[in-house]
Amino acid sequence: MNTIINILFWTFTIGLVSAILILKIKMDALPVTKRQMLVSSLYGLTISSFTPKILFVIIISILYFSNYVFSETESLIIVPTVGLLAGFLPFFVIVYAIFKGAYKYKVYRIEVAHKELPEAFNGYKIIHISDLHLGSFNYRYRILERAVNIINELEADIIFFTGDLVNNYAWELNGWDKVLKELSAKTGKYAILGNHDYGDYSKWDSPEAKSENFEEIKSFYDKIDFKLLLNESVTLKRDNQEIAIAGVENWGLPPFRQDGDLLNALNNIEDIPFKILLSHDPTHWDEEVIKYTDVALTLSGHTHGMQAGINIMGKQWSPIKYKYKRWAGLYTVENQNLYVTRGLGWLGFPGRMGMRPEITLITLKKSE
């Protein structure tokens, strides 16, 4: 029996490693429409296969180097038990993250109070979503239709999307216009670009092909009745009072592109006290926004909350915190606020562990 288990174990492991190596070598020869599905599938298999093994080795090593001496009888009980827990528990957690966690949408309800908010906008409801990465859904429209229904039931005044509509390609958008056009808001829908929307993570036959792909992605927003803000702004009026909405192109620390032009986006709205900024990467807030502007509320995405972490009873942790200072939730510095969403889609690992896909409902409040 042990021999059969060993054979199956090593056959699966060697087969998985071989598949990864072959995919790496043959990647450029694969049709682009199949790459995302294959990469995500292998990514999920790799995580679910090697995480339990690594955890088992770590635990056994700790027991070994702690000089704790087991009797032969104890070893026959403890080691298999550790192996069982270290192997099966993470495996089932990962499987749940892939098949359930990635699509278990959660509504986060946030209030943002600010003294400069006009009285006419007191109670104004904003839906904030980000990082759809539509290619990852592999045209499973019904999965995202559930999110659309949840959003519409919240009856928001306005919807903001803060970038990463696709993974790389415009063809990922095929058929999604019928789904996303159903998103409804009382006073409008606005969007910006994220780093993945520029096609920088793919090889192109020519600069013209990349440019054409980029233009198709931008024009998609017309099909779903979203206004794409490219380093520009709009004003919203209620009862002769107004607030401003500005949106910038992607701005992140290297190696991410810095096409966002904050000064140009705010150029025509300096005299409007309450401004909302859409900026995909939250590092932009610390590097430019709070240094040079008086923007009341900035909305960002990008981090995904790493799609893995702990988020229980108001306490949250994720390894992504060691890369991004502002990685999920509401942050405030004096009179300026930043909200970073955990994202609605996924990229790479096809699942979410402890960081559910997020729909954010932000209610603006007038403060004294």
Model regions and ranges:
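Non-catalytic terminal accessory segments
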Residues: 1-103
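Short, well-ordered helical secondary-structure segments
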Residues: 29, 36, 87, 92-94, ...
